């Protein structure tokens, strides 16, 4: 019988998930710290279960989300600068750059949500904590629904469930291997 310790991953992931949720009120730096802690937790889980995909898929998802946010910030900035310095008849260019940015944001967010869903499905499979599977599904559905704004609420629910999922992890698992 092999004993696999999950206690460290449980607390790293749980605290990281709390930081992500609190970042809406406090600021983006907490979100970065939260994602780093979750990535550390998933790296530990990947090593425990000898499956790099758990870590890699979540990492891909987060990187895509970061790129999506940077693109939309850049597009909004370009649009405002264009509208400020370019005659009004060129406003269409500013609007089109904004729309391209929003479309790219949406596409990258959905793909990122899909990767996070896949990562959490694996965590659920290995640990037996079904909250991870549901959390991943809600992240994906939330990113799909971002286009109608309701997705933000679904993502917040996913983040709350993510906290529950991490703190529901057992301190250790026993395997027959």
Swiss-Prot record:
Keyword annotations of the record: Cell membrane, Membrane, Transmembrane, Transmembrane helix
Residue ranges crossing the lipid bilayer per the database entry: 20-42, 62-84, 94-116, 136-158
Membrane topology: Multi-pass membrane protein
Subcellular location: Cell membrane
Pfam families, A to Z: DUF996
One GO CC term on file: plasma membrane
Chief site of localization: membrane
Protein name listed in UniProt: Uncharacterized protein MJ1644
UniProt source species: Methanocaldococcus jannaschii (strain ATCC 43067 / DSM 2661 / JAL-1 / JCM 10045 / NBRC 100440) (Methanococcus jannaschii)
Lineage, opening ranks: Archaea, Methanobacteriati, Methanobacteriota, Methanomada group, Methanococci
